Every structure is written in C-alpha cells, then in structure tokens.
Amino acid sequence: MIGCISPIFWGLSVSLVRTLSETLGVGKGLAINYLIALVFVFLLFGIPNLKAMPLKYYICGLGCAIGTSMTFAFSLGLAKDGTQTMEVGMINYLWPTLTILFAVLFNGQKAKWWVGIGMLLAIYGIFVVLSGNLLIDFKAMWSHIKSNPISYFLALWAAIFWAAYSNFTRAWAKGQNPTTLIFALDTIFFNAIWLLDLAPSYPWNTKGVLFAVGSALIMGSAYGMWTFGVQKGRIEIMSIMSYFTPVLSCIFASLLIGAKLTHEFWVGVSIVVLGSFICWAAT
C-alpha cells in the first residue's frame, strides 16, 4: 500500500521539475532540490547496509537510478513550453508498461497472454498524444519529435532506466533501501552542473525556493515509498496503480504550468489508463 502512494507524487514531478527549470535553472534548481531531499530521506530512511548489496546492483541498479534522474530532468528542462513538457512527460510514462514487461521477462513475474494487449494500448495512447489524432498521424508525430528530438529521446530513456531500476532493486538490493545513496549521488551530479555552469541558471527568487523545498519533500517521499514497495510489495500491482499517474500529471500541469491539453491528448491519456485495467486482469 505504501508503494502505491508514490504514483500520486510522481504525478506532481513533471510540473515541479519544469517549474524549477524555469525559475532557477535545471542545474541550480535541482541541486537545491536534491540537497534538501537528501537530508529528508536520510532522516526518513537512514543509510543502507552498503556491504549487503552486491557489486552488480551498484553498477546496474544505481546506474539506472542516476540515469533516470539525469534524463528525466533534462528532457523536461529542454521542452519548449508547457504543452511540449506534457508530451515529453507522457513518453516518460511508458515506464509502468516497461516495468511489467521487464518483470515478466527477467524477474519471473507470471502474466496472462493478454497483458500484451494492455501494453500495446498504453503505447497506442502515447502515439495518440504525440500525433494528436486517434488514427495516429505518423507525419504529425514525427514533426513533434523532430522539433525537439533530444527532449523526447531523453524522456524515453528515463522510462527505460526507471523500469530497469525497479526490477534490479527487486532482484538484487537484498532488502536494502538505497534511496539516500541515490539522492546523495544526484546531489553531487546536479551541484556539479550548477557550479560548472553547464546549464542556464537564474537569480534566486521566492517561487523557485518554495518549489525546490516542496519538490524535495515530494520526490524524496516518492522515491523512498516506491523502492520500499518494489522490495516488499507486489510490483505488478504498483505498476498498475502507476498507470493513473498520467491523469494526475495532466491535472497538475494544467494548474501549475499552464499546459494547454487538447481533447485528443486527454483521449490518449485515457487509453493509457484503459491499458492498465487490461494489464491488471492479466497479472
């Protein structure tokens, strides 16, 4: 149950990261965000037993976690406006589908054959979002992607990295919660980007600081609860619950970053959610 709360917080993450990028800059905003979050998750979860986790988990599991942070942040930071931010965010929301796929292929999760139908529906929903057409206008979809290919490409890799992290954690973390370690590494990475001036940085402002604090608490809680859930709970149920994250994300985006979402966009999101019920029935 604890792990199932995290998708609610994930729904806020797209708008929060985008706002931080606009108010303080990707490097500066997320450096402060992860520094505060590091203190929070340390008090909440402490330090894991580093000797208990095998080397392969440090390389693969933590590597994927850091990869997620980098690709997710820059995919949103490079988006041109609120609407494109949500398009990029929807690509990132392929991670629930990929989490189930990886669990079936590599972690011994059992599923009925029609789980594939649910996964295809989720992918179809993403295509509808990107093309703006129920019949999938590949030309329009390609035009969207071509306008900012790096942003869309990074979003896809963020989805792949997070799905892999979830399954590596389930298989190899030995019951340890590495959230504090992950946030420590993220803090180092984003502070390096800020201090080395590798990304645009904006003057300090009240809105940016408030969002950094709020985002830190939300992201820290989401990471920790998700990691606890994939270790102790049923990863397939958590993945299904996470299918509702796109709906929450769209609602928050409309309120926080002024994203203008079309009817076709909402239909595409609804199709993604429909895929969740089919996957639920199959697992």
Task: Give the ranges of each region predicted by the language model.
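Membrane-interface helix termini and inter-helical loops of multi-pass transporters
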Residues: 15-23, 77-81, 130-147, 194-212, ...
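Hydrophobic alpha-helical transmembrane segments of multi-pass integral membrane proteins
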Residues: 1-2, 27-44, 55-59, 118-124, ...
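Hydrophobic transmembrane alpha-helices of multi-pass small-molecule transport proteins
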Residues: 41, 60, 111-134, 243, ...
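Hydrophobic/aromatic residues within transmembrane alpha-helices
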Residues: 20, 29, 75, 105-111, ...
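Glycine-/small-residue-enriched transmembrane alpha-helix faces in small-molecule transporters
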Residues: 1-28, 137-171, 217
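Specific alpha-helical transmembrane segments that line the substrate/conduction pathway
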Residues: 28-38, 76-107, 235-255
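Specific transmembrane alpha-helical segments of multi-pass solute transporters/efflux pumps
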Residues: 9-16, 48-86, 128, 216-233
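Hydrophobic/small/kink-forming positions within alpha-helical transmembrane segments
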Residues: 11, 15, 42, 62-66, ...
